[in-house]
A protein has these predicted regions:
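Glycine- and other small-residue-rich loops at beta-strand/loop junctions that grip anionic moieties
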Residues: 104, 169-173, 198-199, 222-225, ...
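Metal- or metallocofactor-binding catalytic centers and their adjacent structured scaffolds
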Residues: 5, 39-118
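Shared catalytic-loop signature of beta/alpha-barrel
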Residues: 65, 211, 217, 228-348
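N-terminal basic, low-complexity leaders that serve as flexible interaction/assembly modules and, when applicable
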Residues: 1-69, 311, 364-379
């Protein structure tokens, strides 16, 4: 199964007014992704997703130039060999670091799709798992900085649909953040309420919200600080009283090794389209398992990442939640990839049953939605 071609498709679409949620990183104005196709000489085709990295054209160019030259001609079944070749040439020395990890993630995911198709197995079975239900929480670019009453209007139909956990966006300021959390907790006393500050907090902000987080039984506080701010994570862990979560902006097992050893973060959130692909997130999950830590992956833009994430969670022993994207009008979820991943009435999701990722990509969609330049979030 020699790799014959690798092609990246940077793609974008503008968000609708109702989908422009405000978060700690700004207000969403467009959605970006980098879809990756790998073809073999014997006619197999695999699809993956690389995160946009807020510069999808850059990631696409890296895949279509340097990384293509590194992987074309190699054995598509040798995912470890391909991963190591890119690591040696780009990640170990003088490479583009995070951009390479992101680009490699899309290629790696496509190679696992090919491996599954070659043997006729869904990815979860290929990884040693089974078709088991994976608990989901309502997340994605949604549940942002709305007034409490409007936020409750968003949460109610999600609970009615079966979700037993939701993630609220905080990071505006301690007072309005706590007001939103209190409103949701008051109406839904048994709901697992998770919160995400999208790196917008200071240690003093965490100190101010900590009593409220404990009072309202918040399940985790996600990314209060940027990923490199190890000192703030260590400080907040001493007093916050709820688990700290992070990982969507950490790359490869080498960065997760420090995250685990520091001991401040108790919920790990690698992204299969950022952290190094399926291959690397399996390693991260094994590392976390040795420390008795759950893995709750961050999901990216399209149904490719979403399908791969559910497959992986159905195959690792320390699986946590699947982050279900409940944002409005996400064409990458609803039109680019099929079939969809419906949430079951009990708030779980089943992995696709088809070979590989078990989903199909609409190439006409990619042709109709070229990349849109500029930032995806504005303040």
């Amino acid at each position: 199964m020699k790799i014959e071609d690798v092609t990246a498709f940077p793609t974008s679409f503008p968000v609708t007014a109702r989908a422009g949620a405000r978060l700690g990183i700004g207000r969403a104005v467009k959605r970006d992704a980098v879809v990756v196709r790998v073809r073999t000489a014997d006619g197999l085709e695999g699809w993956g997703e690389a995160h946009h990295a807020r510069s999808p054209g850059t990631i696409g160019h890296l895949i279509n130039s340097t990384l293509r030259e590194l992987v074309v001609g190699r054995d598509a079944a040798d995912v470890i060999g391909v991963w190591r070749a890119v690591y040696d040439a780009q990640l170990a020395s003088h490479g583009l670091g995070a951009a390479t990890a992101i680009a490699l993630s899309g290629i790696d995911m496509a190679l696992w799709d090919i491996r599954g198709k070659a043997v006729g197995w869904p990815l979860h079975r290929l990884l040693g798992g089974a078709s088991r239900p994976v608990p989901a929480y309502a997340g994605g670019v949604a549940l942002g900085w709305s007034p409490p009453a409007a936020l409750l209007d968003e949460v109610r139909p999600l609970v009615e649909a079966g979700y037993r956990a939701v993630k609220l966006r905080i990071g505006e300021a301690p007072a309005p953040d706590l007001a939103r959390i209190a409103a949701v907790r008051a109406e839904f006393p048994e709901l697992d309420v998770l919160v995400d500050a999208n790196t917008a907090y200071t240690v003093e902000d965490v100190r101010r919200v900590a009593p409220g987080l404990r009072e309202h039984r918040v399940g985790w506080l996600e990314e209060p600080f940027p990923p490199h701010d190890h000192r703030s994570y260590a400080a907040a862990a001493q007093f916050v009283g709820v688990p700290l979560a992070a990982g969507e902006n950490h790359y490869t097992r080498f960065e997760f090794h420090r995250l685990v050893e520091d001991g401040a973060v108790r919920v790990l959130q690698p992204d299969l389209s950022k952290s190094g692909g399926v291959t690397e997130v399996l390693r991260i999950a094994a590392l976390a398992s040795a420390w008795k830590l759950p893995v709750n992956p961050h999901t990216a833009s399209t149904g490719l990442n979403m399908a791969a994430t559910v497959h992986l969670l159905a195959a690792v022993e320390n699986a946590g939640y699947y982050e279900a994207d409940v944002s409005h009008d996400n064409l990458f979820r609803d039109e680019l990839v099929s079939p969809p991943l419906p949430t079951q009435p009990d708030g779980t999701v089943l992995p696709p049953s088809g070979p590989g990722l078990g989903v199909q990509v609409d190439e006409d969609f990619l042709a109709a939605h070229p990349v849109i330049e500029g930032p995806g979030f504005v303040r």
